[in-house]
Amino acid sequence: MKNSSIIIVIFSMVLFSCGGSGSSGGNGVVPKTSKSDVIAKLSNTNWEKECSPYNKLSSGDLTDSWNVKIKLSIDSSLKSTYRTEYFHPTDTECKSMMFNALDISKFDISGKVISEESIEANGLNETFIYNADNRDIPPNYTLIYIESEKLYFGQKSGLNLGETPETRHSSISLDNYFTKVVN
């Protein structure tokens, strides 16, 4: 019986010293972000990406990257509008726009995904509903991550090309992000 009392006392001390209830009320534990939290953070927001290289237009004789500025608006239904301004490859400060393009897509946020960099992101299924080139753009299966005033998207890595849910992008570059526009 004496051993039982000692065990109960030790257990009580350990439980008390750890905070007891497990709630996050001021004990430094940050609650995990839910899907609805991510949707709320994205709804009715505007984002922009500063001047950066873009090489998806490279072909044949033209191998240089264009430089682009991208403005992204996301409405309450998670319809996203990308307005991309293209600048000559030598215009690294994006001073004189050559042309622009408009793409509209629909975001569908899925569950938690841990990236290759151990970042807790959400899956993003993006379906394009309009683009300026009238191209048939396949759905994009990627990642989405919000940290403070920065918005990150997944990127291709190995066999994870984002073509199907099974080959969803699995990497996030913290050097490649959109900044929230505060009105």
Predicted feature residues:
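Sec-dependent bacterial lipoprotein signal peptides
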Residues: M1-C18
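Bacterial Sec-dependent N-terminal signal peptides
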Residues: V14-L42, F178-N183
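N-terminal export/targeting and maturation segments
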Residues: N27-E85
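Contiguous, well-ordered beta-strand patches that form the walls/edges
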Residues: S52-G60, T81-E163
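Intrinsically disordered, proline/serine/glycine-rich low-complexity cytoplasmic regions
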Residues: E166-T167
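C-terminal partner/receptor-binding element of secreted or periplasmic proteins
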Residues: S170-K180
